[in-house]
Amino acid sequence: MQKFIIHKGIACPLEYANIDTDQIIPKQFLLAVSKQGFGRHLFHDLRYLDDKESVLNMDFNLNKKEYQNSSILVSFENFGSGSSREHAPWALVDYGIRAIIAPSFADIFKNNALGNGLLTIELAKDEVLEIVDELKKSQDKNIEISLLEKRVFFKDKIFSFDLDNFHRICLLEGLDNIALTLKHEAQIKAYEKNSKSFLV
């Protein structure tokens, strides 16, 4: 998993509340078990005008020239609602999204996202609206995020956010669940060696 310490990138506003996991990655694309290849299907029903993904919907912000190569999304409340599918953060990460800023996230999506290296940043609704309005007006659409400082830098504004220490350390060190387990491999083996078996 890629480390997240400081990231600067183009931010794209998605002015929708309650974006659910089926909108993020529709169910017909969930057949694969690898984390790669889902990015092309991200927001399928919003990004494309046809099922073959050959005609882009140019009214959708991610398809607009100024938001191409976006690595940060700024959206509205309850992002990631709906069914629990880890493919949703897989699709976002595979597309190149490193962070999402919103007033709130669905709990399961948030945990899945953080576990896959995707930073979820919760800001007050008025702060999110301020960022969205400025993104639409400004030619410079770059936002800088410091996980070390837990701050978002945009124009001359600084927005502070909170994140629990466990997920913060995992992101800073680039540790997913498997890497985190392997980090404690010696202790696990020592425990298994010294623990008594209850099988007879």
Curated annotation (Swiss-Prot):
InterPro entries: 3-IsopropMal_deHydase_ssu, Aconitase/3IPM_dehydase_swvl, AconitaseA/IPMdHydase_ssu_swvl, IPMI_Swivel, LeuD. It catalyses: (2R,3S)-3-isopropylmalate = (2S)-2-isopropylmalate. One of its GO terms (molecular function) is 3-isopropylmalate dehydratase activity. Its EC number is 4.2.1.33. Keywords: Amino-acid biosynthesis, Branched-chain amino acid biosynthesis, Leucine biosynthesis, Lyase. GO terms for biological process: L-leucine biosynthetic process. SUPFAM superfamilies: LeuD/IlvD-like. Catalyzes the isomerization between 2-isopropylmalate and 3-isopropylmalate, via the formation of 2-isopropylmaleate. NCBIfam families: leuD, PRK01641.1. Belongs to the LeuD family. LeuD type 1 subfamily. Heterodimer of LeuC and LeuD. This is 3-isopropylmalate dehydratase small subunit. It comes from Campylobacter jejuni (strain RM1221). The gene is leuD.
